[in-house]
């Protein structure tokens, strides 16, 4: 066998292996929607946004973590950002909801973790905010902390997350590429009966529609009948009945950030569209699911100063008529972020020997190929 033939055989056998090792949906030629993703296809494509994660994967039964999302690099309490929260199904323990609903702004990093670690995360965020320069006189802080219940794989009753873990996630937050799958707050989560986790995606609007970026990050821990690019994957795999075993205490946290100048009213409208993205994947917002969407505008011109001598606030706001492209971007990015969390997931064994298999990507890709959904 000559050298050229040997190299050809090597590539013939190794390329399928490399392809299946790739962890994101688009790496396999599957495109969701019609809008273009950002450079990284992550929430950090939104200028200034930072994400930090702390993964706690120890011993036989600790499978949990922290994911922190910072809308900008400054003092968020002193420079608040417009925000809204939409509740798709309210079986959850989202801290900070009522003040965001009332005032329409966010004043801390957004933290995602497990259900029983919400109080710990709130304490950590309060401490972090109090210690920021210029916050010496602050007496009230609205920490926003979301959660899903990772108790099937994780010893959630052990409450292993500490304030130091939360602070590490915040302090290590950065722009640029980020990890997906079984990392951070997604370490022990389950989605459609397969290993879920953290997923992210982004969309950039055409210049004629404003050129704005929408980024989405999800923590997937919910059930339903999985669909990928419109293909009934869960039904074809005969796996959908298994997904309901894990859904009663499941949830999906969705964080939508955009540099479009939006007020809290239109941010709530934007947040509602994330639920449409969830439904495109086969999610059903079950009785026991806490499906929350946190939407934030990072536009610098829209920031809200903590203190101001001017009682009138002049803030640029996108007109209602310009919202439709942003709605589409949110739907597409949410759908792809959820699927990315599944494609990045790896089989995991956790508490009491419980085992959750990764999505069988080979079988899924073959179904998509047969349905004509692959670009290559």
Question: Which residues fall in each region the model found?
Answer:
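Bacterial Sec-dependent N-terminal signal peptides
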Residues: 1-22
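Alpha/propeptide regions of enzymes that mature by internal proteolysis
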Residues: 22-376
